[in-house]
Amino acid sequence: LICLLIFVIFVESLVAKEVNIYTSRHYDSDDALYQEFTDQTGIKVNVLSGKGGALLERLKFEGKNSPADIFFTVDAGNLWKVQREGLFQPIKSEEVLSKVSSNYRGPNNEWTAIAKRSRVFFYNPKRVSSKEISNISYESLADDVWKGRIVIRSSNNMYNQSLVASLIAKNGEKETEIWAKALVNNMARKPQGNDRAQIMAVANGEADLAIANSYYIGIMLSGNAGIDQLNAAKKVKMIFPNQSGSGAHVNISGAGILKNSPNPDNANLFLEFLLSEKVQKNMVKKSYEYPIAAVQISDEMAKFGTKFIEDDTSVKRFGELNPTAIKLMDRVGWK
């Protein structure tokens, strides 16, 4: 009876509290996740949305008085920036650590992947031959055959910085610099626009191949982004690079518990909630990402295959090599 009473008091103390999330994810579907967590636990979710850099500056300004419990963002590089400032604490939940392999967790287990995405190729099948895409890789985009045919966004984009960092980790800085210089020479235009703009350029005949994150094609095919993007998405095909070798570059959406979290127990519960099978299934069906748990992906993404060879480079390397990647991209004239 005493043990039961202690448990009830513990649960009630959790219910009485809240969890405060700083997020740079911009998915409307996340709001439904927050509400589901509240419905399931009784814990109120307070959300502050913004750009990753602005939220990081806010955390630094707030210091020990910060109300934030969790930092939720996209790209391992952004999580690394928060960790570099000493703003995370190690995740102690065995439930979380047992579900996420070490290459998808940060140093010291200070952050974890919640979902995955791959940086893939989108091509126009009317302008790219089957021979050209056979055994295609990131490295092969340096070949002369791609001169004036490739579009990709700017070098100040974190997704590209992390891709280059992963290539440095795999191939070394010197070889990656040679590759990046050739890639710049093969671009169809000066980098401009977001990932979807690259896919649109291929669909519209401005280029033959785009490098972009996988989930964008799901968003476009869903029709939620409008008829123009839906029609464009139907004109292109997606392919995973490096399937005969090291595998396609994989990055993450991820989260960590902040060092000065006033509600660390609730924060741990929230991470466990995000990695539960039911939530993983619902989340990736709406965000078009790939799950951490072994659950079904969205119908839109399943059209391109449910399994692919993933590069197993630890995502923590993307942050560690970020400064090197930025300098390299600058040296080769990647605008």
PLM ranges: what are they?
Residues 2-12:
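Bacterial N-terminal signal peptides
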Residues 253-313:
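Mature extracytoplasmic/periplasmic domains
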Residues 299-335:
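Extracellular/periplasmic bilobal clamshell ligand-binding domains
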